[in-house]
Amino acid sequence: MRALGAVITLLLWGQLFAADFGNEVTDIADDSCPKPPEIANGYVEHLVRYQCKNYYRLRTEGDGVYALNSEKQWVNKAVGEQLPECEAVCGKPKHPVDQVQRIIGGSLDAKGSFPWQAKMVSRHNLVTGATLISEQWLLTTAKNLFLNHTENATAQDIAPTLTLYLGRRQLVEIEKVVLHPNYSEVDIGLIKLKDKVPVNERVMPICLPSKDYTEVGRVGYVSGWGRNSNFTYTDHLKYVMLPVADQDKCIQHYENSTVPENKIPKNPVGVQPILNEHTFCAGMSKYQEDTCYGDAGSTFAIHDLQQDTWYAAGILSFDKSCTVAEYGVYVKTFNILDWIQKTIASN
């Protein structure tokens, strides 16, 4: 007896016994274990309970307990013969980050605090980021997907040119790319993998938010494979803690970064990010360290202390700040939640 990767355990010994050996479920014949003694005015009922492996949880409207009826069918009181499913746990890293460490010139993430972080390599070995949001889907920016492609490139053209790694450089195959229908204003794309990835300590999706976590002052963490203080790509995942900034100040900062008539840079940035109702800004930390080239596509991860769960509040779109600008710019995940869910459901 098996059920979608679940482990089945016997609640009361009887004619059928299902045991858990490691992650395998083994049936034992009727005569392999003694029958329970009879009791006066009572009877023996055979029950099994479905449980999930580590890093998965049971999804069912019932309680996961099934009884053997007179027709030798396993049924649950609430859902009948319908079996439960084991869905991947999200936003529950085994080793959550517990101190401030940074991307630019910072310390390393040696503990797997960001198991949703993916490393994406595009044409000509340009490194960017992507964020695992389910067993088979990742978020990244449209700009990342179009790197070294013409503006006329299609999603079908782009997908074969990407290489994607999860966990400890686990290579995963890409099935397709889906661009946001308004990607010039909403810098987002989805990546679908050919197969679901096993969820474990090093590979785990981050949860999608059910509310907007981007109020000014909220602190989040951004991990990344982008360039370090020497402007060379790092071989190790690093991270930074940054506060959400005032949007008006952020807009004013970038509006003043160029002279409108001839676009002569007034500061080292000189590039205009996309800023609109779908974006928010995160400011420089007090350590004067920041995200940089190659970190785009990574998530602004928020730890909801009440739920003890990590949520993807945003996706880094503008990663050109590199300590010379005050703000990085992110796409609000909550604003595109409906598109994400509909796209995944229809694909």
UniProtKB/Swiss-Prot annotation:
GO terms under cellular component: blood microparticle
Record's subcellular location: Secreted
Protein name as it appears in the record: Haptoglobin
SMART domains: Tryp_SPc
Gene Ontology BP annotations: acute-phase response; defense response to bacterium; immune system process
Predominant place of localization: secreted
Pfam families named in the record: Trypsin
Function description: As a result of hemolysis, hemoglobin is found to accumulate in the kidney and is secreted in the urine. Haptoglobin captures, and combines with free plasma hemoglobin to allow hepatic recycling of heme iron and to prevent kidney damage. Haptoglobin also acts as an antioxidant, has antibacterial activity and plays a role in modulating many aspects of the acute phase response. Hemoglobin/haptoglobin complexes are rapidly cleared by the macrophage CD163 scavenger receptor expressed on the surface of liver Kupfer cells through an endocytic lysosomal degradation pathway.
Domain notes for this protein: The beta chain mediates most of the interactions with both subunits of hemoglobin, while the alpha chain forms the homodimeric interface.
Signal peptide (residue range): 1-18
Assembly behavior: Tetramer of two alpha and two beta chains; disulfide-linked. The hemoglobin/haptoglobin complex is composed of a haptoglobin dimer bound to two hemoglobin alpha-beta dimers. Interacts with CD163. Interacts with ERGIC3.
Organism: Oryctolagus cuniculus
Entry annotated with the keyword tRNA processing: no
The encoding gene: HP
Entries under InterPro entries matching the protein: Haptoglobin, Peptidase_S1_PA, Peptidase_S1_PA_chymotrypsin, Peptidase_S1A, Sushi/SCR/CCP_sf, Sushi_SCR_CCP_dom, Trypsin_dom
Span of domain Sushi: 31-88
PANTHER family: COMPLEMENT COMPONENT 1, S SUBCOMPONENT-RELATED, HAPTOGLOBIN-RELATED PROTEIN
